[in-house]
Design a protein with these regions (language model features):
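N-terminal chloroplast transit peptides
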Residues: 1-16
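C-terminal substrate/ligand-recognition segments
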Residues: 388, 464-483, 509, 516-541, ...
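C-terminal amphipathic alpha-helical interaction region
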Residues: 548-607
Length: 607
């Protein structure tokens, strides 16, 4: 394929980063006590992520002003450049100069333990955001791209990735209404501002608990809320009456949890001793090495490079290509740290004008317990699976080798972005993979195979109901974001959609859609979860289920899917990986097959 050949040629022209003596085995980096490594704040120190300006909060202003000056230069340059591939390269460099400040600041504003850094990062985000709004309504800039895309001969001469990136930049312009007349353009800008304000208010409201008078609670449960004052806070409740046999929408999580515990004996404390963080990281490195020729190494960060003493820096190294990028692991709990597990792009990869490749840099944020003097950090099965999930995102970023940072790594369509991370969950639940690293931290005993089997089978309890719930959510999201004005209230639509797509009844006088935060972050895209899971399941079944360490399949996975980031149509990547064109029925059937209690994915022999 043209993209694959061009990628191969690109890789051959890159400078190989050789092995560094600063690298150490990844497991060792996570077995050292975090408390034993204090940030040295004495003397001269570098900046966050190695950015010299960010040795102090004031550096954000310096960095943003530097980026804004470069942006102005690039705008003048692209407007004076004849239409052609160079137009797209300059647009991407312009985007990169802003993203390298905005993406970094977007992370620091929520994760840095020092208020001054968070506030400075917040201001940088606002400043860069204002510039982006101006650029998206800059008519001269828009016309420089329009001249390229309006010339059919020029467009036909572009390679597929360059054409796709040009079209994505044009889409950003049109979302801002720049192609409209002045009156409509102003209306579009005003609507976008209103959408942002309403979205922010909605998200804040989804997290506020309800306060009600105690006298409104049923007498049989009132004694559970003996609190001072006349009000109680209601977060989530379940039925307390054993003989109440009517199943309500809030009951399935409770009862499915009971069934898992009673039928499969999967008490987390039985598993945690086998999942020390160091062992899990070694397992990931081993898996990546066997599948992709990639290893993870710990690297000592420079003074001032990290924001907390327990952050680890990993170098991602290919056996023949050398250094691919860096992953900063912010894994441990601390005061004021957001309670969310996520992946942040700090710097996207791209091919620079000098022929070198700008290495990607990402952060993985988890909330794991700290180790102690006598006890390493031990993960529950859920934590272990989540670690694998987030590392799937990280490797997507590391192995993307796009020419343009605008489509690097995870900067791809939402319904494809979760495929690499969900695929990693299948590896995390395969005994042949788990057996390679799950050892009791004291005795060295391997995790028994039957324990892995029980754990995997337990996840299928009520899985069909869970999937039906996801279908209901996705359908509701599509209707809410369909043709407007809506034919009835959002609550009436909720009731009708629930009765059509879900097996449990709507509860009168409730409006839980007002707390469904995904309507903002995944508006009109909630189906992406099911779509990504279907694709990941098909890739697992057809490429890795027989042998999870299949190097040929791993190389194809990198070449056909990971390497392209968002620079190629997702379905073309899926077709390249599966070597066929899957149908909707194929996707549905693979999701249904995952529910089969006789499904042997996790029980296959290692031979």
């Amino acid at each position: 394929m043209l993209c694959a050949r061009r990628l191969g040629g690109l890789r051959a022209g890159l400078r190989v980063r050789r092995v560094s003596t600063r690298w150490s085995p990844v497991g060792a980096a996570f077995t050292v006590q975090p408390q034993g490594r204090r940030l040295d704040r004495s003397g001269e120190r570098g900046g966050l992520f190695g950015v010299p300006e960010l040795s102090a909060p004031e550096g954000f202003r310096v960095a943003q002003e530097k980026a804004l000056r470069k942006t102005e230069q690039l705008v003048r340059r692209v407007c004076a450049t004849p239409p052609g591939p160079q137009t797209v390269l300059i647009f991407d460099e312009l985007s990169d100069s802003l993203c390298r400040v905005a993406d970094l600041a977007d992370f620091v504003k929520i994760a840095h333990p020092e208020v001054a850094f968070r506030e400075a990062a917040e201001e940088a985000c606002r400043s860069i955001g204002t510039m982006v709004e101006k650029l998206n309504t800059n008519v001269d800039l828009y016309q420089s791209l329009q001249r390229l895309l309006a010339d059919k001969k020029l467009v036909d001469s572009l390679d597929p990735e360059t054409r796709r990136v040009a079209e994505l930049f044009m889409f950003d312009f049109e979302i801002s209404g720049i192609h409209l007349d002045q009156e409509k353009r102003k209306r579009a800008v005003d609507l976008n501002v209103k959408i942002l304000d309403l979205s922010s208010a909605f998200l804040m409201g989804t997290h506020f608990p309800n306060t009600i008078g105690k006298h409104l609670l049923p007498e049989r449960i009132r004694h559970h809320f003996e609190l001072a004052g006349d009000h109680v806070v209601v977060d989530s409740l379940r039925a307390e009456v054993p003989d109440d046999l009517e199943l309500m929408p809030w009951d399935p999580p409770y009862y499915s949890g009971l069934i898992r515990a009673e039928r499969f004996n999967i008490e987390p404390s039985l598993y945690c001793p086998f999942f020390s963080l160091g062992a899990c990281m070694e397992g990931l490195s081993l898996l990546f090495n066997r599948l992709l020729g990639v290893s993870l190494y710990g690297e000592q960060p420079a003074k001032g490079e990290v924001w907390s003493e327990d952050v680890r820096k990993l170098a991602v190294v290919h056996e023949s290509e050398g250094l691919l990028g860096y992953i900063y692991c912010d894994f441990f709990q601390r005061a004021d740290k957001p309670h969310q597990d996520c992946h942040f792009t700090i710097r996207g990869g791209r091919l620079k004008e000098d022929g070198d490749y700008q290495l990607p840099v990402v952060v993985l944020m988890l909330n794991l317990p700290q180790s102690s003097r006598n006890l390493p950090t031990l993960l529950t099965p859920g934590m272990m699976e989540n670690l694998f999930h987030e590392m799937g995102h990280a490797m997507h970023s590391m192995l993307g080798r796009t020419r343009y940072q605008h489509v690097t790594g995870t900067r791809c369509p939402t319904d494809f972005a979760e495929v690499p991370s969900i695929l990693m969950e299948y590896f995390a639940n395969d005994y042949r993979v788990v057996h390679q690293f799950a050892r009791h931290y004291q005795t060295g005993q391997s995790l028994p195979r039957n324990m892995v089997s029980r754990l995997c089978e337990s996840k299928k309890v009520c899985a069909a109901a869970d999937m039906q719930l996801q279908v209901f959510y996705a359908a509701l999201d599509q209707i809410y974001h369909g043709k407007h004005p809506l034919q009835s209230s959002t609550t009436d639509i909720l009731r009708d959609t629930q009765e059509r797509f879900y097996g449990l009844p709507y509860v009168p006088n409730t409006a839980w859609q007002l707390r469904f935060s995904h309507l903002v972050g995944y508006g009109a895209k909630y189906y992406s979860y099911l779509m990504s899971r279907a694709v990941a399941s098909m890739v697992w079944r057809e490429c890795f289920r027989q042998n999870p360490f299949n190097r040929a399949a791993g190389e194809r996975y990198r070449r056909e899917m990971l390497a392209h980031g968002g620079g190629r149509e997702p379905m073309l990547m899926v077709q390249g990986m599966l070597q066929k064109c899957p149908s909707i029925d194929d996707f549905v059937n693979t999701l249904v097959s995952d529910l089969d209690l006789d499904f042997e994915t996790f029980l296959m022999d290692s031979t």
